[in-house]
């Protein structure tokens, strides 16, 4: 068929053109689709004499192309095939280029090649094949190109480094990629056979191994892809393989072969003139490397280690037994660098010197997520700056500790020195917490040299014991990732990252892999046996394994609120030490229930609970009990580190405790006895000596307690004197030494170990003190303080030759809410004095308390150089020299015990200031620093205390400060007092918008109810709420004329938003803290004009007892025209009943806003106001960007199916967003799906609800699946909820996009005119008739009513079904009025609007002489002018019976075979079609002619038979 042939030719031509286009357009990258089955050539003959060889290996190579044809092991003469087809082209810039090749054998081991593309003038490549040992290396040593013909990338797709075939026994190709879905292995092991499926295109992997039963081969390459190439992520395109037909095997079955080739090489990135490393690949050949009597992929994996490009710092991994995260955040400096050094020493003593990696999160600027794109040059001064940082590094090395830092090369914050309009893209927002970050232009960063300069600056400034760089939130792959890794590696850093998939070439530690709270089971650790076989000791990124285990991190230094040192230690002993013991050796054989390793190690079992680890045949671990040999030599880290691995001590641990007997390994079995030490906070504690009997020892252990055993007591690991406080001017500032040996303690003061295992000093119940002569201080001002859990306590500093300076406090209601502080949840706060040292010398420090039952605890004494702020009042603060924290303010309860969103902001004009990138306010108001709150959590943001700002009872004060506020009524200035441990708020004043620096001034009187305080509260919930403060001044105005109330008053709204024209509820809560009862209590509201209120419950009380409360519910009527934001105030007034008797009042106010006006045109959901605050599974819901992280505005662009959407909502399951549309919108439209950012991860179910009723529910939407476009009728809903539900076991990665979300509201929706219908002709009704009235387009579940008019007769009420249909079953009464009527139906239409519809109805008298035909007619159109005859004719066939027509005609439907189209009642003619179609409805029948009746009956039968034949 020529036509079909032409169509096929056209289709093929289209495919060819499409492929050509892809090749041309893909010049800057390699597409996976381009590796189709290559053209096959005849098998290559071995070129005589063209072979190269080492002492171990002979390789036959092609003279016509740099391909190995075969490998022969010299000692065994065993053989492995190389290429079986001749390559004749190289893919350059995505296009296959035919080439000419010449070759020359340079020496016995080397052949050189010159490769010249036929069609690229001026381009040539020098290449080489060289064999050394058991390894063949292919490399391109030179690329020559021209400006017109640049070589950007290249690939030899069918170089076929090794080929195995199903014709060879044991033919296998094992490959691996990094899979972080715990349920999905990253391994593919292909055992080639005649049934192996052929591959239409190549498959790719990060690692590949080929084997037969003779030899195995491992491969390495520097394959690299440009960033943005889909093959690049997780280095999954390093190796290509493809199952192809290989003729017919000896058994007559089809044979299948598979070859392994390198992936593509990148020479120049798109837009770059810089060239990358020249391409190379390697093949290493191996026999039975693990001596298990067979050759398989595991032998190739062992051999691969000899050519592997190992991760930088990989050799350090096995000695990083203890990983911990000292955390500094938001200017709090809770872990100064010298404090961390002491913690490192403390851990070393508790673990007898196990190797540590201390990862500093917050070493820059104001701490974590502050200017962390500044790798160097911006060290956290409040934590000690560069000097103390390097002291920490150098001091930690003697205790087996090395350090890492948390850097960010994805996002930058405006405060960073590196920040600029060129450095970032100001339109792309990133993480948003303390500040809004912006995504770095990484290509420019690389090409400008900025990235490497920042790396080099860190390397040059920090000491050599900084060995690791943890790269946060790094998503890039390919070239950008390679250049960052290379820069860090060249600078001597090992690489770690948040994700196990990031930077896989060098990633040695993944946070999500070690801390299982992150990521969910489908995005957490690397699940691949092959990669772990190779690199088990080089990385900590692995899935849990029942034999090998996996490393974990359990924190205690404030990261993610963790503060349990006991749990930290338990993780070391119960999990990490056995993992690291196995990592000391390399895996050699891995079976389902056993793993063999070098060093004589073997693991057997089925789970961690029953596994046994043996060394040299001796069990050293049984389940959760062990006696592990270890080296006592201090460990060192970094490039060139050499560690003594001699096993000369033993670690003993039993999870449950008890007595156990252990056979000793040969190193210890000959000893006569072993010294056993219990490990404590202070190091080794000698328990005694245990005899060695027949090479065994019997030990008794406490549960979860670690011990060390040595044959020689002189074998130690940790220095005897830890010298706590070195460099800090305070000896043992954290009370880590036993017995307060560096302090003068009196009155029973001692060290206490808290329930979390933290060490503090505790003063005795009698008069008690601790004191110390500090280190010598140079002249100047100093802040000297300590963390104190306060009851009456005095901190005194006496300078040498000077007068004592002290501060005394007796109580505090200020709970510690700082999540980064181990003391969170307690009432520890920092107590300090500012001291001027006139003459150099050593001051005396004393912390004392009088006798009392309440405990006083002390920790972290610190001396910091400071500058006093001059004041004209009792206190001034300009935040220019704050030593740590936000003094005089401390964090309040906003967000609870969490990381605050307030910090001391640093000027970096113009980026931190008003006007840049749409900023409406400045972060910094004066000089260099201001206190800045960024979109803070609701609650008390910060407050003073009686020791940061002492306010005396009975005096009046003025508090003033400079401020800017981006929005009105988002923050309030509050004051109150502490009643015991409970802060009581007594006054609140909303802060108006101020986009220029404005002076705030307010007076308050301090009462006798408790210590007075002032502070900032976040009351609003709007995004973009900024508040900056500077130049705080507190002045004493003298005695107060008023006595403040000892009471609190709060006011809350009972609804998210105020509904206009409706009654809204408010609740006022009054609580008295007066010492005695009060009288005449009255609570009143102060409302905006036009608003009215009535108390639904009592608002007055004649008396109220001490500590009593009054709750008043208010009904507030809001005018229909109210619109916008309002402030509702409340005031409580009462009289005291004991001295001082008088009137008291407490006030408060709350900000509310009214329902937005419903849209009147099509409106994007992201441009509309939410009702309340949406709930969301991760961070906040985002507008016009995807979900992002924990802060507003930190998501990437919305992207579904490769399409970027500028408008929409970014949510995360489980999520709920409410809108008010006021029945004015007909439909909601959106494109829904899981954002492309999550790739194949995440799943969720979307739904739309109107007024609480389900309108739409999606199927399960999964990452990587196609998005869906939805249009949902709203059926008149007033409120619309957009919900996303969790699908599956967890909601990890469920970034749920409502892209292009829009409400269709182009015009006000008019009520639908209902169209009721009857089940019978409308003029056929008679008294007593039964019929159905049906009406549709109603709102599902609504009630409709029917009436007969004009004399209304109720026909009933019916509820519409799910399809919006109501059916009324009606039977007319016998006395129903005759004549013309209307049936009127009223109800609610599908849009929720009141609707009406009518249908005419005629009720006639019953026919006194009805026809008797057996099949009465049902014609739907009996004519419009009926005759007057009294009866119709009879029909015995299929004819019809006229119901009152003139006797000159019959109207009918012709029985069951067709409907009459109606007839003219006067002429009897029928205007319809054929006889069969009209059913004789127009046939004239003269009266009295019976024959005709018979003919009609017969004809009806005939026609009926014809219709159904």
From Swiss-Prot:
User: Which residues lie in Gly residues bias regions?
Assistant: 1429-1439
Chief location of this protein within or outside the cell: secreted
Q: Which reaction does it catalyse?
A: a 3-O-[beta-D-galactosyl-(1->3)-N-acetyl-alpha-D-galactosaminyl]-L-threonyl-[protein] + H2O = beta-D-galactosyl-(1->3)-N-acetyl-D-galactosamine + L-threonyl-[protein]; a 3-O-[beta-D-galactosyl-(1->3)-N-acetyl-alpha-D-galactosaminyl]-L-seryl-[protein] + H2O = beta-D-galactosyl-(1->3)-N-acetyl-D-galactosamine + L-seryl-[protein]
The listed locations are: Secreted, Cell wall
Q: Which InterPro entries match?
A: A-galactase_NEW3, Endoa_GalNAc, Gal_mutarotas_3, Galactose-bd-like_sf, GH-type_carb-bd, GH101_dom-5, GH101_dom-6, Glyco_hyd_101_beta
Q: Which residues are listed for Ca(2+) 1 binding in this entry? A: 288, 290, 292, 294, 299
Q: Where does substrate bind?
A: 369
* Propeptide regions on this chain: 1479-1509
Signal sequence region: 1-41
Fetch the Pfam families from UniProt: Gal_mutarotas_3, GalBD_like, GH101_dom-5, Glyco_hyd_101C, Glyco_hydro_101, NPCBM, NPCBM_assoc
Pentaglycyl murein peptidoglycan amidated threonine PTM sites in chain numbering: 1478
- Compositional bias segments (type: Low complexity): 1407-1428
Q: Give the EC number(s) listed in the UniProt record.
A: 3.2.1.97
Which chain regions cross the lipid bilayer?
Answer: none
Positions of short motif LPXTG sorting signal: 1475-1479
State the GO CC annotations.
extracellular region
Q: Where is this region: Catalytic?
A: 313-585
Identify the keywords attached in UniProt to this record, alphabetized: Calcium, Cell wall, Glycosidase, Hydrolase, Metal-binding, Peptidoglycan-anchor, Secreted, Signal
Stretches the record annotates as Disordered: 1176-1197, 1403-1439
Q: What does this protein do?
A: Probably involved in the breakdown of mucin-type O-linked glycans. Specifically removes the T-antigen disaccharide (Gal-beta-1,3-GalNAc-alpha) from extracellular host glycoproteins.
> What's the family?
Belongs to the glycosyl hydrolase 101 family. A subfamily.
> Mind telling me what this protein is named?
Putative endo-alpha-N-acetylgalactosaminidase
- Say which species the protein is native to: Renibacterium salmoninarum (strain ATCC 33209 / DSM 20767 / JCM 11484 / NBRC 15589 / NCIMB 2235)
